[in-house]
Amino acid sequence: MTVATILATRNLGLDIGGATIVADVDLEVRDGEFLGIIGPNGAGKTTLFNLFSGLYEPTSGRIELAGEDITGEPPFRRSQRGLGRTFQVSSVFPLLPVVENVRLAAEARIGGTLRVWRRAAGFRAALDRAVWALERVGLAARAGWVAGALSHGDKRKLEIAMVLASDPRVILLDEPMAGVSVEDIPELVEVIKSVQVQDGKTVLMVEHHIEVVTGVAERIAVMHHGKLLAVDTTENVMQNEQVQAAYLGEPL
Protein backbone atom coordinates (compact mmCIF):
# COMPACT_ATOMS: atom_id res chain seq x y z
CA MET A 1 0.00 0.00 0.00
CA THR A 2 1.32 3.42 -0.94
CA VAL A 3 1.67 5.84 1.97
CA ALA A 4 0.37 9.33 1.24
CA THR A 5 2.68 12.32 1.21
CA ILE A 6 1.73 14.80 3.96
CA LEU A 7 4.42 17.47 3.45
CA ALA A 8 6.39 18.20 0.30
CA THR A 9 8.69 20.77 -1.24
CA ARG A 10 9.14 21.34 -4.96
CA ASN A 11 12.38 23.02 -6.10
CA LEU A 12 12.38 25.04 -2.88
CA GLY A 13 14.99 27.77 -2.66
CA LEU A 14 15.90 30.81 -0.59
CA ASP A 15 18.38 33.56 -1.44
CA ILE A 16 19.28 36.25 1.08
CA GLY A 17 21.47 39.19 0.14
CA GLY A 18 22.78 37.43 -2.93
CA ALA A 19 23.70 34.29 -0.99
CA THR A 20 21.93 30.99 -1.60
CA ILE A 21 20.78 29.57 1.72
CA VAL A 22 18.52 26.77 0.46
CA ALA A 23 18.73 25.44 -3.09
CA ASP A 24 16.41 23.21 -5.14
CA VAL A 25 15.11 21.13 -2.25
CA ASP A 26 12.72 18.39 -3.34
CA LEU A 27 11.45 16.49 -0.33
CA GLU A 28 8.43 14.27 0.26
CA VAL A 29 7.50 13.40 3.84
CA ARG A 30 5.23 10.40 4.31
CA ASP A 31 2.15 10.65 6.46
CA GLY A 32 2.91 9.26 9.92
CA GLU A 33 6.66 8.86 9.50
CA PHE A 34 9.53 10.07 11.66
CA LEU A 35 12.05 11.92 9.51
CA GLY A 36 15.35 13.04 10.98
CA ILE A 37 17.19 15.99 9.43
CA ILE A 38 20.93 16.25 9.99
CA GLY A 39 23.81 18.27 8.63
CA PRO A 40 26.68 20.49 9.76
CA ASN A 41 26.12 23.96 11.18
CA GLY A 42 24.96 26.33 8.47
CA ALA A 43 23.64 23.53 6.26
CA GLY A 44 20.17 25.11 6.12
CA LYS A 45 18.24 22.83 8.46
CA THR A 46 16.58 25.48 10.63
CA THR A 47 16.09 27.67 7.56
CA LEU A 48 14.15 24.81 5.99
CA PHE A 49 11.91 24.70 9.07
CA ASN A 50 11.45 28.47 8.83
CA LEU A 51 10.30 28.02 5.25
CA PHE A 52 7.93 25.22 6.24
CA SER A 53 6.36 27.28 9.03
CA GLY A 54 6.09 30.52 7.04
CA LEU A 55 8.66 32.59 8.90
CA TYR A 56 10.62 32.91 5.66
CA GLU A 57 9.20 33.30 2.17
CA PRO A 58 11.02 31.25 -0.47
CA THR A 59 12.48 32.89 -3.54
CA SER A 60 11.67 29.82 -5.63
CA GLY A 61 9.62 26.65 -5.50
CA ARG A 62 6.65 25.76 -3.33
CA ILE A 63 5.56 23.94 -0.19
CA GLU A 64 2.59 21.57 -0.04
CA LEU A 65 0.73 20.34 3.04
CA ALA A 66 -1.64 17.44 2.44
CA GLY A 67 -1.49 18.16 -1.28
CA GLU A 68 -2.36 21.86 -1.01
CA ASP A 69 0.02 24.69 -1.86
CA ILE A 70 0.70 26.68 1.34
CA THR A 71 3.71 28.63 0.04
CA GLY A 72 2.16 32.08 0.41
CA GLU A 73 0.25 31.47 3.62
CA PRO A 74 1.19 33.18 6.93
CA PRO A 75 2.37 31.13 9.93
CA PHE A 76 -0.96 31.25 11.79
CA ARG A 77 -2.79 29.81 8.79
CA ARG A 78 -0.29 26.97 8.50
CA SER A 79 -0.79 26.27 12.19
CA GLN A 80 -4.54 26.11 11.67
CA ARG A 81 -3.95 23.65 8.84
CA GLY A 82 -2.08 21.38 11.25
CA LEU A 83 1.59 22.35 11.13
CA GLY A 84 3.12 22.62 14.61
CA ARG A 85 6.64 23.57 15.61
CA THR A 86 9.08 23.90 18.48
CA PHE A 87 12.19 26.10 18.35
CA GLN A 88 15.87 25.78 19.32
CA VAL A 89 15.39 28.47 21.96
CA SER A 90 12.71 27.78 24.55
CA SER A 91 9.48 29.57 23.65
CA VAL A 92 7.45 29.09 26.85
CA PHE A 93 5.96 31.96 28.85
CA PRO A 94 8.13 31.68 31.99
CA LEU A 95 5.89 33.68 34.34
CA LEU A 96 2.70 31.79 33.49
CA PRO A 97 1.65 28.46 35.00
CA VAL A 98 2.55 25.40 32.97
CA VAL A 99 -1.08 24.56 32.24
CA GLU A 100 -1.79 28.12 31.09
CA ASN A 101 1.02 27.91 28.55
CA VAL A 102 -0.64 24.86 27.04
CA ARG A 103 -4.18 26.22 27.27
CA LEU A 104 -3.19 29.31 25.30
CA ALA A 105 -1.69 27.09 22.61
CA ALA A 106 -4.97 25.17 22.39
CA GLU A 107 -6.91 28.41 21.99
CA ALA A 108 -4.61 29.64 19.23
CA ARG A 109 -5.07 26.42 17.24
CA ILE A 110 -8.83 26.57 17.25
CA GLY A 111 -8.58 30.18 16.13
CA GLY A 112 -11.75 31.40 17.77
CA THR A 113 -12.36 35.05 18.58
CA LEU A 114 -11.84 36.38 22.08
CA ARG A 115 -15.61 36.59 22.37
CA VAL A 116 -15.89 32.86 21.79
CA TRP A 117 -13.14 32.01 24.23
CA ARG A 118 -14.65 34.10 27.03
CA ARG A 119 -17.50 31.64 27.11
CA ALA A 120 -17.16 29.01 29.82
CA ALA A 121 -17.53 26.12 27.39
CA GLY A 122 -14.70 27.37 25.19
CA PHE A 123 -12.39 27.92 28.12
CA ARG A 124 -13.17 24.48 29.47
CA ALA A 125 -12.49 22.81 26.12
CA ALA A 126 -9.07 24.46 25.86
CA LEU A 127 -8.26 23.59 29.47
CA ASP A 128 -9.26 19.95 28.97
CA ARG A 129 -7.02 19.79 25.92
CA ALA A 130 -4.16 21.29 27.94
CA VAL A 131 -4.57 18.79 30.78
CA TRP A 132 -4.57 15.93 28.27
CA ALA A 133 -1.40 17.20 26.57
CA LEU A 134 0.42 17.58 29.89
CA GLU A 135 -0.50 14.02 30.82
CA ARG A 136 0.85 12.82 27.47
CA VAL A 137 4.29 14.30 28.11
CA GLY A 138 4.45 13.45 31.82
CA LEU A 139 4.00 16.96 33.22
CA ALA A 140 0.53 16.67 34.76
CA ALA A 141 1.98 16.85 38.28
CA ARG A 142 3.62 20.17 37.44
CA ALA A 143 0.58 21.79 35.82
CA GLY A 144 0.40 24.48 38.50
CA TRP A 145 4.09 25.30 38.48
CA VAL A 146 5.37 28.54 37.03
CA ALA A 147 6.91 27.49 33.72
CA GLY A 148 10.18 29.27 34.43
CA ALA A 149 10.79 26.96 37.39
CA LEU A 150 10.94 23.84 35.21
CA SER A 151 14.19 22.12 34.35
CA HIS A 152 15.38 22.56 30.78
CA GLY A 153 14.29 19.04 29.92
CA ASP A 154 10.82 19.68 31.32
CA LYS A 155 10.60 22.94 29.39
CA ARG A 156 11.19 20.91 26.23
CA LYS A 157 8.37 18.59 27.27
CA LEU A 158 6.17 21.63 27.87
CA GLU A 159 6.90 22.90 24.36
CA ILE A 160 5.89 19.51 22.96
CA ALA A 161 2.69 19.62 25.04
CA MET A 162 1.94 23.08 23.63
CA VAL A 163 2.31 21.73 20.11
CA LEU A 164 0.19 18.67 20.88
CA ALA A 165 -2.56 20.87 22.30
CA SER A 166 -2.83 22.53 18.91
CA ASP A 167 -3.72 19.12 17.41
CA PRO A 168 -1.19 19.20 14.55
CA ARG A 169 -0.85 16.70 11.73
CA VAL A 170 2.85 17.48 11.28
CA ILE A 171 5.27 18.42 14.07
CA LEU A 172 8.59 20.16 13.42
CA LEU A 173 11.07 19.72 16.28
CA ASP A 174 14.09 22.02 15.99
CA GLU A 175 16.94 20.60 18.09
CA PRO A 176 14.77 19.45 21.01
CA MET A 177 17.80 18.04 22.86
CA ALA A 178 19.66 21.38 22.88
CA GLY A 179 20.58 22.27 26.45
CA VAL A 180 19.02 19.10 27.89
CA SER A 181 21.19 17.18 30.34
CA VAL A 182 22.54 13.80 29.28
CA GLU A 183 20.48 12.16 32.03
CA ASP A 184 17.23 13.67 30.75
CA ILE A 185 17.71 12.89 27.05
CA PRO A 186 16.43 9.26 27.08
CA GLU A 187 13.14 10.25 28.74
CA LEU A 188 12.63 13.12 26.29
CA VAL A 189 13.35 10.80 23.37
CA GLU A 190 10.66 8.41 24.63
CA VAL A 191 8.15 11.26 24.84
CA ILE A 192 8.92 12.35 21.28
CA LYS A 193 8.73 8.82 19.89
CA SER A 194 5.41 8.17 21.64
CA VAL A 195 3.95 11.28 20.01
CA GLN A 196 4.64 9.76 16.61
CA VAL A 197 3.64 6.18 17.42
CA GLN A 198 0.72 6.59 19.84
CA ASP A 199 -0.74 9.83 18.53
CA GLY A 200 -0.10 9.08 14.87
CA LYS A 201 1.71 12.34 14.17
CA THR A 202 4.21 12.98 11.40
CA VAL A 203 7.43 14.19 13.03
CA LEU A 204 10.38 15.99 11.45
CA MET A 205 13.30 16.51 13.80
CA VAL A 206 16.45 18.56 13.32
CA GLU A 207 19.02 17.28 15.78
CA HIS A 208 22.81 17.29 16.25
CA HIS A 209 22.82 14.20 18.46
CA ILE A 210 23.30 11.55 15.78
CA GLU A 211 22.58 8.70 18.18
CA VAL A 212 19.20 10.25 18.99
CA VAL A 213 18.29 10.60 15.32
CA THR A 214 19.34 7.09 14.37
CA GLY A 215 17.44 5.71 17.34
CA VAL A 216 14.06 7.14 16.39
CA ALA A 217 13.99 8.13 12.70
CA GLU A 218 12.69 5.83 9.99
CA ARG A 219 14.42 7.93 7.34
CA ILE A 220 17.07 10.61 7.49
CA ALA A 221 17.51 13.66 5.26
CA VAL A 222 21.02 15.07 5.10
CA MET A 223 21.56 18.73 4.24
CA HIS A 224 24.84 20.22 3.08
CA HIS A 225 25.38 23.78 1.83
CA GLY A 226 21.62 24.32 1.58
CA LYS A 227 20.99 21.25 -0.55
CA LEU A 228 19.64 17.79 0.17
CA LEU A 229 22.60 15.45 -0.05
CA ALA A 230 20.64 12.28 0.70
CA VAL A 231 17.23 11.08 1.86
CA ASP A 232 17.11 7.41 2.75
CA THR A 233 16.66 4.86 5.51
CA THR A 234 18.77 5.39 8.59
CA GLU A 235 21.00 2.42 7.76
CA ASN A 236 21.62 3.51 4.19
CA VAL A 237 22.37 7.10 5.15
CA MET A 238 24.87 6.05 7.80
CA GLN A 239 26.69 3.95 5.19
CA ASN A 240 26.59 6.64 2.48
CA GLU A 241 30.15 7.69 1.64
CA GLN A 242 29.07 11.15 0.47
CA VAL A 243 27.33 11.72 3.78
CA GLN A 244 30.36 10.52 5.71
CA ALA A 245 32.68 12.81 3.77
CA ALA A 246 30.47 15.91 3.83
CA TYR A 247 29.00 15.65 7.30
CA LEU A 248 31.39 13.73 9.47
CA GLY A 249 34.61 13.61 7.48
CA GLU A 250 35.08 9.93 8.28
CA PRO A 251 33.10 6.67 8.15
CA LEU A 252 30.50 6.13 10.84
Residue ranges and their predicted role:
Residues T2-L252:
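Glycine-rich phosphate-binding loops of nucleotide-dependent enzymes
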